C-alpha cells in the first residue's frame, strides 16, 4: 500500500510540474486579454491553471499570462462545455490565470493540477469529476451534488449547500461536502471524505480510507 501511495503522489506531482519545467519558456511579460466565447454551462480543464469562476451575468472570460504563452492556451466551447487546455508544453514562473463569469455553471471536469474556485452556484444539480491533483473549491446552493475524485485531488465543497450528495473517492483524494438530507459515499484506497450537515449517510469504505462527520460552522 505504501508503494502504491508513493507512486500516486509522484504521478500527481509530475502533473503539477508539467508546465513549469519543460517546453516553451515564458517571456516574463504579463499580458491580459478578453476572449469571446459561445454559451457554456460546464468547464473542462487539462493542465495546471489558476481559475476563478463567478456564477453571474454577463458571461465573460479574461486570461492573464506571459504574452508569448497566451496563444498556447486554448479556450473553446463545444456542446455547452468550455474546454481549457494547453496546445503545447511551456515553462513559466507562475500558472496562467483565468477569471470567468457565467450565468449558470452545472459542472467542472479537470485532469492535471492547478486551482479552480467557483462561487455563486445556484441550481438544481452540480457535478464534479476530477482526475489528477487539482485543488477545487465550490460555494453556493444546489439540490443535488455529484463528486467523482481520482488521484490526489483536494476538493472542498462544504460551502456548497446541497440536499443530496453522491461521492466516489479514489486514490489519495480528500473531499469535503455539505449534505442536508442524504449522503451516499464510496471510498477506495487511502482517500478521505469529510461531511457536514444532518444527512442520512450510506457509506462503503474499501481499504484504509475514511468517512468523517464534522460539525457545521457556527453550530
Where are the regions a protein language model picked out?
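C-terminal motif of bacterial Sec signal peptides marking the signal peptidase cleavage site
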Residues: 13-16
Amino acid at each position: 500500500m505504501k508503494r502504491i501511495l508513493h507512486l500516486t503522489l509522484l504521478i500527481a506531482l509530475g502533473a503539477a510540474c508539467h508546465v513549469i519545467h519543460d517546453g516553451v519558456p515564458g517571456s516574463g511579460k504579463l499580458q491580459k486579454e478578453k476572449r469571446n466565447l459561445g454559451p457554456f454551462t460546464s468547464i473542462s480543464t487539462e493542465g495546471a491553471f489558476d481559475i476563478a469562476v463567478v456564477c453571474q451575468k454577463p458571461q465573460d472570460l479574461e486570461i492573464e499570462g506571459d504574452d508569448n504563452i497566451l496563444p498556447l492556451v486554448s479556450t473553446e466551447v463545444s456542446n455547452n462545455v468550455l474546454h481549457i487546455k494547453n496546445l503545447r508544453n511551456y515553462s513559466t514562473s507562475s500558472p496562467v490565470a483565468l477569471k470567468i463569469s457565467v450565468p449558470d455553471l452545472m459542472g467542472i471536469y479537470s485532469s492535471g493540477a492547478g486551482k479552480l474556485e467557483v462561487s455563486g452556484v445556484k441550481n438544481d444539480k452540480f457535478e464534479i469529476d476530477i482526475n489528477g491533483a487539482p485543488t477545487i473549491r465550490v460555494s453556493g446552493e444546489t439540490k443535488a451534488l455529484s463528486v467523482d475524485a481520482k488521484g490526489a485531488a483536494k476538493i472542498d465543497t462544504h460551502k456548497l449547500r446541497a440536499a443530496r450528495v453522491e461521492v466516489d473517492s479514489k486514490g489519495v483524494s480528500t473531499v469535503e461536502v455539505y449534505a442536508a438530507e442524504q449522503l451516499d459515499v464510496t471510498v477506495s484506497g487511502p482517500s478521505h471524505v469529510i461531511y457536514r450537515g444532518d444527512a442520512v449517510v450510506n457509506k462503503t469504505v474499501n481499504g484504509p480510507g475514511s468517512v468523517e462527520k464534522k460539525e457545521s460552522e457556527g453550530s
